[in-house]
A protein has these predicted regions:
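Mature N-terminal, pre-catalytic/accessory segment of carbohydrate-active enzymes
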Residues: 1-49, 526, 536
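Conserved, mostly hydrophobic/aromatic
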Residues: 21, 96, 145, 163, ...
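Short, acidic/polar
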Residues: 29-43, 213-221, 340-347
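Substrate-binding cleft and catalytic face of glycoside hydrolase catalytic domains
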Residues: 46-295, 328
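Active-site clefts of carbohydrate-active enzymes
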Residues: 267-293, 306-340, 365, 369-379
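Aromatic/acidic polysaccharide-binding cleft in carbohydrate-active enzymes
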Residues: 320-441, 445
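Carbohydrate-binding surface patches
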Residues: 414-461, 466-486, 523-531
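C-terminal beta-strand-rich structural cap/linker in extracellular carbohydrate-active enzymes
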Residues: 488-536
Length: 536
């Protein structure tokens, strides 16, 4: 397969929207030293500017405590005394700022004493996901929180932050015990409370899964004079909980409760052959299969959804505050180059429709379901619990370094094998990315290599040509870990060994130059990535 990069290819600014933000485990995680070290690594090496997490108001942050939450003895719920403090959120945001980043503030979830119902989400840390029982009390709480931030960090700093109301309110069981109307009302009173303290603060939503509710949300805000500065939503290629939105009308989706009601499983059959001592991960993987491996999903889903959402947003900037190749926690592909190939291609294809985005998430220091002990357990992170960089980390680092201009190559991203090209501002260096992307990664491991020929029109022979690959042998920490026997409790020496053995960098590459054309040849198997750097 041959691709040509013409000398006169027009260039446009390369919009690295994934550097806007990154997702994270819940707020309390940001008080861990290892979390903070990895967050700084993500900022310093990938250039990511913000971090977003759930649960800044959850009970483990102790922002609103009563006698019944502190000392739940019989009759304590009748005692009227309470304590409202944002000391722990302050420690969390202090750590974010020390890492060189800014918080993308997700206003979630509900302090349980303030909730209309005691509904808990399905997470390991059990957040309260009900709406407030007293709207005036909630608004006063939000206003006090905003004043706390302004006092602690200053008006000039906080006005650069973003405030997003809740997370995925369309998913009733894990995130919001209410209707669409309930969420819209919650958004309205919350946004108005924020603006009442400082009208320059940026507030937005609806923070839905699968690009849903945007048109209805915009209409509601207009009808109720609810302030909204930006639109947020989420999109995964495969999602086992809420169904994949692979349609132009992003509003008409099944309710999560309907999907779960249809989900029937015979656990006796499901767990046949497993032994209790095998641990939780094999059981979990059978319970939540990775549908990116079994279903024929749209490789252009993020682009198609973002294009539609941009139209529905009615001129407001669109931020995808969660996205990735797979929403299945524990999926084997999350530790492999499969997600790297998908995310890089998706980021490039959706570039024109997204103001900023946030890959979910930066680290396997993460406790939504359970803190799995295996170093490679299919977590969402760019790095493992011990900070070992996964293939997606390497891919984003290389893509971020590719240049500030992107060459316009119509149709070059359309096929399974695709290319993109970038140059620096001075036009002294050109980087070409070639990849063979397919979500059926494990089924496609044995596919034959595809020969790829890159032809670049150049006025003169280049000073150097270098190649950096992410494939089965390069940038594959999972393979290194497996080769050492899959140690569960890794020593510092073992961690460093995997880091060293899976590091990737550019090396001289063979090429031909004749008649004003540079030719580089390589081969790609499923989900390989090849970065070619040409110094003119």
């Amino acid at each position: 397969m041959k691709f040509t990069i013409p000398a006169n290819a027009p260039a446009k600014p390369f919009h690295k929207h994934w550097q806007f933000c990154v997702g994270s485990g819940h707020a309390a995680m940001a008080m861990r030293t290892d979390y903070c070290e990895q967050l700084k690594q993500i900022h310093d090496e990938l250039g990511i500017e913000r971090v977003r997490f759930h649960g800044i108001f959850s009970d483990d942050m102790h922002t609103y405590d009563t006698m019944s939450t502190v000392m739940p003895m019989p009759g304590s719920e009748q005692v009227p005394f309470y304590e409202n403090s944002f000391r722990l959120p302050g420690l969390v945001y202090d750590n974010v700022l020390k890492a060189g980043m800014k918080p993308f503030v997700e206003l979630s979830f509900m302090p349980s004493p303030m909730a209309k119902r005691p509904t808990r989400g399905t997470f390991y840390w059990k957040p309260c996901i009900a709406p407030p029982k007293d709207e005036a009390q909630w608004q006063a709480y939000i206003q006090k929180f905003v004043r706390f931030l302004l006092n602690r960090y200053g008006k000039e700093e906080v006005e650069t932050w973003f405030f997003e109301v809740w997370n995925e309110p369309d998913l009733k069981t894990p995130f919001f015990d209410g209707t669409q109307e309930d969420y819209f009302r919650l958004y309205e009173i919350t946004a108005k409370a924020v603006k009442a303290v400082d009208n320059k603060l940026k507030v937005g939503g609806p923070a839905t899964s699968n690009s849903k509710w945007v048109a209805a949300f915009v209409d509601y805000c207009k009808a109720h004079d609810a302030p909204v500065d930006f639109i947020t939503t989420h999109q995964y290629a495969g999602d086992p909980i809420s169904e994949v939105c692979d349609q132009k009308d992003a509003d008409h989706m099944k309710d999560t409760a309907e999907i779960q009601a249809e989900y029937k499983v015979d656990f006796t059959q499901l767990f046949a052959g497993l032994k209790p001592e095998d641990g939780l991960l094999p059981m979990f993987r059978r319970t939540m299969p990775d549908n990116t491996e079994t279903d024929d999903l749209n490789r252009d889903l993020l682009r198609d959804a973002a294009e539609q959402v941009q139209k529905q947003a009615d001129g407001l900037p669109v931020y995808y505050t969660e996205w990735n190749g797979c929403a299945t926690f524990g999926a084997r592909g999350n530790d492999t180059r499969k997600v790297a190939a998908y995310d890089v291609r998706a980021a490039l294809s959706a570039e024109d429709f997204i103001e900023g985005s946030s890959i979910w998430c930066f680290s396997d220091i993460f406790e939504e379901l359970h803190p799995f002990p295996e170093e490679f357990h299919g977590g969402y992170g760019l790095v493992t619990q011990h900070g070992i960089a996964k293939p997606l980390f390497h891919a984003l680092r290389l893509l971020g370094q590719a240049g500030d201009k992107r060459l316009e190559l119509p149709g070059a991203l359309d096929g399974e094998v695709s290319v993109a090209a970038f140059r620096d501002a001075a036009d002294t260096q050109l980087t070409v990315l070639a990849t063979k992307q397919n979500l059926h990664h494990f089924a496609g491991q044995s596919t034959p290599a595809t020969p790829v020929e890159i032809e670049v029109e150049l006025d003169a022979k280049p000073q150097s040509v270098q190649l950096c690959r992410i494939d089965e042998e390069h940038g594959n920490p999972l393979k290194c870990w497996q080769a050492m026997g899959e140690p569960e409790d890794m020593t510092p020496a073992q961690v460093q060994q995997v880091i060293d053995e899976s590091a990737v960098d550019y090396a001289p590459a063979p090429y031909e130059y004749a008649d004003g054309k540079l030719t580089v040849k390589t081969e790609l198997v499923t989900n390989d990535l090849a970065f070619i750097r040409i110094v003119k």
